[in-house]
């Protein structure tokens, strides 16, 4: 590869072009280099080797049945206590009614994540999955992070495997990747002390994969973590993916510095920079060689930067969302949803091929043009 300005990238580029795995030290170089054009070219080489110009999105709706939560993560602006202003807590019928009001033809995914409610029994969550599958046949339910599965395990006094088996029998199709934050214990003690441990998160996803439940993985960055801790997070995911092959995508999530305790403690008002976001996506694409997709989540990146990210290793921009709440309550300035046409246009204008998918990355439609 010609035009490499940082000599440290030469052996890394050779590995990438030969399809060889990068080391932890290689990953640190990618985070440190100022040769961003080469970093971009390498990440794009891998994305096109895996998927060509195809870029995926899903027709989805986001549902948060409650924001009542006892966990107290310091980065969260979503959580509320009982009786607190802005708190909500829906029963099964209210969730179904809410989705029906916003249902659009062609919807393929209902994405459920919410607070850790201290009083709802596990049966409520099973009933909710069943009700959604019954009322919206053919729509896939992607529901509850490993942190929520850990919570269900505690309230039901059941091992992870039994919780996941019951959810799958109720109709669960896939799991999102939230709750991972940063695996480093130093960071988790500060930002998510009461949440599932890193080891617990990984064990839940390992168990889900063994049961045939595909999952995703996230990383929250741009707060107090170091570059080494970001890479350690990816390294643990890569090792689990070697073992199970059950992850579909990796989604880096930029910290949103509004209305939360962590931002106030840090005196932080600025969002991550575009270059940090793009570098992070590129490093992920190069380091996580066994992950099918790296997702540029437009709700935190902005639609414009998500479009640029398609040259930095990204092959998925998430979906229509339809009233996403969690990152927007933390200050994300992006829209709460985009139409399929808007997403397809973003992808087409970047010179890529828009592919509408379902929750399991099965192709639904290839968009060859977008009508004005």
Swiss-Prot record:
The keyword Iron-sulfur applies. GO terms for biological process: menaquinone biosynthetic process. Binds 1 [4Fe-4S] cluster. The cluster is likely coordinated with 3 cysteines and an exchangeable S-adenosyl-L-methionine. It comes from the Bacteria. The keyword Iron-sulfur applies. GO terms for molecular function: 4 iron, 4 sulfur cluster binding; 7,8-didemethyl-8-hydroxy-5-deazariboflavin synthase activity; aminodeoxyfutalosine synthase activity; iron ion binding. Pathway: Quinol/quinone metabolism; menaquinone biosynthesis. Its cofactor is [4Fe-4S] cluster. Its EC number is 2.5.1.120. Signal peptide: none annotated. Pfam families: CofH_C, Radical_SAM. Residues 53-292 form the Radical SAM core domain. Coiled coil: none annotated. Radical SAM enzyme that catalyzes the addition of the adenosyl radical to the double bond of 3-[(1-carboxyvinyl)oxy]benzoate, leading to aminodeoxyfutalosine (AFL), a key intermediate in the formation of menaquinone (MK, vitamin K2) from chorismate. This is Aminodeoxyfutalosine synthase. It comes from Thermus thermophilus (strain ATCC 27634 / DSM 579 / HB8). The lineage of its organism: Bacteria, Thermotogati, Deinococcota, Deinococci, Thermales. The gene is mqnE.
